[in-house]
Amino acid sequence: MPQINLTELAEQSFGTSLEQLDDRRIYKLLVKLVQERSATCPLNNGKKKLYYISAEFLIGKLLINNMIDLGIYDEVKDQLTAAGHDLNKIEEFEVEPSLGNGGLGRLAACFLDSIATLGLTGDGVGLNYHYGLFRQRFVDNQQKAVPDEWLGEQDILVDDDRSYTVEFGDFAVTSKLVNIDVPGYGQPNKNRLRLFDLASVDDGLVPGSSIDFDKTEIAKNLTLFLYPDDSDEQGRLLRIYQEYFMVSNAAQLLIDEAIERGSNLHDLADYAVVQINDTHPTMVIPELIRLLTTEHGIEFDEAVTIVRSMVAYTNHTILAEALEKWPLTSLQKVSPAIADIIVKLDETAKAEHDDPRVAIIDEHETVHMAHMDIHFGFSINGVAALHTKILEDTELHPFYEIYPEKFSNKTNGITFRRWIHGANPALASLLDDAIGTDWRSTGDLSKLAKFADDKDVLERLAATKVEAKAIMRQFMALEQGVTIPSNAIIDVQVKRIHEYKRQQMLALYIIWKYLDIKNGNRPKHPVTIIFGGKAAPAYTIAQDIIHLILTLSQWIANDPDVAPYLQVVMIENYNVTAAERVIPAADISEQISLASKEASGTSNMKFMLNGALTLCTLDGANVEIAELVGDENIYTFGASSKQVEQLYADGTYDAGVLYRKPGIKLLVDFITNPAFMATGNAERLQRLHDDIKGKDWFMALLDIEEYIQTKERVLADYEDQDAWMRKALINIANAGTFSSDRTISQYNDEIWHLS
């Protein structure tokens, strides 16, 4: 490709020099440059194509990421710096797409990057949400959800002339398609993220400051929000309509493209493979069968055989609440044709396996989506070794007995291009100098281990952390209005707010630490504890946990005895942009879910990659991190997954007994201290207090004492910075296992078989 001359481009586009352009116009210039470069990249065009269908893709800002993948980042940055401009400030004009929420969507985004980087033919397929999940605001120390209006300012969507009709029970809608280019790192070709929208969508249904809207106007509201509130019947129906709209478009696209590439559809499995990312796209199975039979004349049994050989399913959860189940009557209302096929598939499954535990439709006429995926897909994978073992041994054991050959593990991964090169350029430079640049494409960081006792390298690593903290402090001051001490230990838990992730346990530690400082035990370094994450609007206890955290933040900030030594910050509207600022700066990575409940996690990998030390239960991928780095380079605590499973099985966990221990009672009752309750919302605090005291379904009280002890050991160890940085380096050196390039290679070698 021709060399880049930004000075010449500035003259051509704006008739002025690069030095005289303001940052907004430079941003427009760079967007145009990236679009033109990407447009010259042909699409990957292998015979067999992957369709990675996901309800969410948390792609983050793309300008810098795409410049890295297109190989022009360093050249652009150098020219801008020479002209007196800061690329990071220019990037601030980019709007982050609101197409995802948490780990599921971020994983999908990392996977698309790796699929393209490995030169594989594969597109992501999802929906173009106009307002995303929601934009989070904090009002009176409580979460307020408002629409996330991002489409008006975006520069990344490219219109596609494909359009499809989706038939519902008593009406039909038309879709339109937009694409986002996905270049691969160091690759001449690209893939795409295909996002379907509703041609008749009406943004006017959404009032400006509320996420409440008419859920019955299906022909106008289908693509307004990701995960619309399903706490009522209309919300549940809307979810099903939305999921069927997504998969019907995906299936029609897949079949059209397969025919264009030469398929006669009897051989469709030679031309296409579908990866179902969690259960939201499950209806692609009956929809493909419907299209093959009614639109293309293939016999039902053959259509089932074809689909069974081309659909694979990734399970992302052990929580029963997250394994989607829908009333058959609701599916019949959304699409009678699809419901009829599901009934036939259920009859087939029951004829093959007379076991009610594996039925697709149970005795209550409820459809179990994961069961359909397992019976009528050819592969099911977990996303961490422990998670897969739990699926095989307990949660999905009846299926494992039937289909052991379908089960495999594919431990999650992250793209190093974004999470080092883009998010932490100082660390990327250190790695280049120490071990060469191959890590950018291979993900192999193991050569770094030989520098574990190299004083110069450790000092430089410490300097990268200082630089990352400075960037984070600037971000927090400008975007969050928070001043963080320059010498603070940065302790971070950023993830969806959920009881099983146990933000409430970290809040109890904060109360303990507050009281300890009040008693005169001042830490040598101030400790800043940072939270980030959203709670589902209908999830009351999660909302209460946010309120507790924000009230603690205010309470501590207003106490002159404690504020110099302890700070609590909750990032408003945590997203990929915030993650790219906070994760490189972290010293401590909080991965404290109840053992057996986190499928994998990926923030644990990002923190590890950026030199934070992990404080964790042995849950999800934490187990694999611990095995890689060794006991001396990680901090583990808590009941094991087997112990937790036994407590659930025999029903012997009693929060009340633990609550009555004086040390624990002191912490829990602080929540309802009259003065503290006067600072917050008494109803919320009382409800959370009572839930922890009397229920504590995810067993925060079981682990709190050992958690406090372990955390205090972490803070003490931080004082020996030489030893701390050695541990950080060993963590980075062992993070290569968690490259999404490795994960995708395994998916392809063992499941997809793309050329």
Each predicted region: which residue ranges?
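A conserved ligand/cofactor-binding region detector
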Residues: M1-S755
